[in-house]
């Protein structure tokens, strides 16, 4: 996943959000 790409950043953000929301 490329951090510089909007889609990649959104995917990582959503993943981290889900992990932290557990």
Swiss-Prot record:
**Key words of the record:** Hydrolase, Protease, Serine protease
**What top-level branch of life does the organism fall under?**
Eukaryota
Give a yes or no for keyword Cell membrane in this entry.
Answer: no
| GO annotation (BP), single | proteolysis
Q: Which reaction does it catalyse?
A: Hydrolysis of proteins to small peptides in the presence of ATP and magnesium. alpha-casein is the usual test substrate. In the absence of ATP, only oligopeptides shorter than five residues are hydrolyzed (such as succinyl-Leu-Tyr-|-NHMec, and Leu-Tyr-Leu-|-Tyr-Trp, in which cleavage of the -Tyr-|-Leu- and -Tyr-|-Trp bonds also occurs)
What are the recorded GO MF terms, alphabetically? serine-type endopeptidase activity
Give its E.C. classification number: 3.4.21.92
User: Coiled-coil region(s) at which residues?
Assistant: none
- State its role: Cleaves peptides in various proteins in a process that requires ATP hydrolysis. Has a chymotrypsin-like activity. Plays a major role in the degradation of misfolded proteins.
Describe its assembly: Component of the chloroplastic Clp protease core complex.
Family stated for the protein in its record:
Belongs to the peptidase S14 family.
The name of this protein is: Probable ATP-dependent Clp protease proteolytic subunit
Q: Provide the organism lineage as a comma list.
A: Eukaryota, Viridiplantae, Streptophyta, Embryophyta, Tracheophyta
